[in-house]
Swiss-Prot record:
GO terms for molecular function: N-acetyltransferase activity. This is N-acetyltransferase 9-like protein. Pfam families: Acetyltransf_3 (PF13302). PANTHER family: ALPHA_BETA-TUBULIN-N-ACETYLTRANSFERASE 9, N-ACETYLTRANSFERASE 9. InterPro entries: Acyl_CoA_acyltransferase, GNAT_dom, NAT9-like. SUPFAM superfamilies: Acyl-CoA N-acyltransferases (Nat). The keyword Acyltransferase applies. Coiled coil: none annotated. Keywords: Acyltransferase, Transferase. Belongs to the acetyltransferase family. GNAT subfamily.
Amino acid sequence: MKLNSNVKIVAKKCILVPYEPCHVAKYHKWMENEEIRRLTGSEQLSLDEEYEMQKTWRNDEDKLTFIVLEMNESGEEVDHMLGDVNLFISTSPSTENPSDDVITGEVEVMIAEPRGRGKGIGEEAVRVIIAWAYENLKIEQFCVKITDDNTPSLSLFKKKLGFKQIGYSTAFKEFTFELPKNRLISEFSSFLEKNAEIKEYK
């Protein structure tokens, strides 16, 4: 998404930056891992295809992508990459009033580097992207789809972030969860102001 092309968000446990060409080779290496592809529902692409995908994501108004970096701004940025966090943006019926259509952000987070797991980095990255999208894109409905064997993600979204189950697909063995509106307002609406600094990404 062009809207975040110059946005850098420095939080307490991680830094979020736009997905740039310099990140593609490392991202492609992550996607060579079959388990990561399975859990993220991703297809294996060639490196050239990955570069084309990065260009597409950059210009796609329906996809918001940040690369997750560890808290270290020295040296090469690519050396500090831990994963990514995304929003897939669409219009769907409101769960509060199905006759009304609302803009919905479907969340996806991946901490691909083992050194970045179990430290609350994925949780913070999700909180940051939701708070940023709520404030800048006026998105007020957020959901996530998680396969029923992805225990870490189920724990993250249910227990730590407070998402509530609204559906289950037996065909895909996949839960759908949604962030309650009251929790969005009480916990996420002021998260950036209290926990992060917005900078210009150069």
